[in-house]
Amino acid sequence: MEEDVYKSLYERPFAEQVAFNLEQLHYRYTRLSEIDTTKKENQKEYLLLFDSFLALFRALFLEKGTRQYSIQKYYCEKGQDDIAKKINDYLDSKMFSWTDKTIREVLKFIADKFVCHVDPITNDDLGLANFYMSHLCNPYVDNNLKDIMETIFGLI
């Protein structure tokens, strides 16, 4: 009986939703990576798609608390705490070698200040967001969006 409840809660409908959301995230990332941002006419499309990507990434991986349902919580509920821990450890690792800012903090800063909420921003916030975004789309640096996606998908 308990096994049937477990399957109905975690393997059937929600597992399909998790798979669908991860597929959508991967699709959005793939489309994002195909946009040539050096051409001015592509920059609005890039920002539009980046917002969509980041909102979903935030919902899937950056939520904390008992009321939100992240991928990490999903793995914990399935008894695969080790995967959830690896994801969290990675997201809590340093984004840059010269500061203690984590990958989670950088992505959440952009998502919360510029995508998911309409928070008051300062010129410093805007400059920081521009720096973070230019870093994320730069193929020649560590912890860019490609590295983050490859690492996350490698863990799950």
Predicted regions located by residue number:
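Amphipathic alpha-helical interface segments
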Residues: 1-106, 125-156
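Intrinsically disordered, Ser/Thr/Pro-rich regulatory regions of eukaryotic transcription factors
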Residues: 119-120
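Long, charged low-complexity segments
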Residues: 105-116
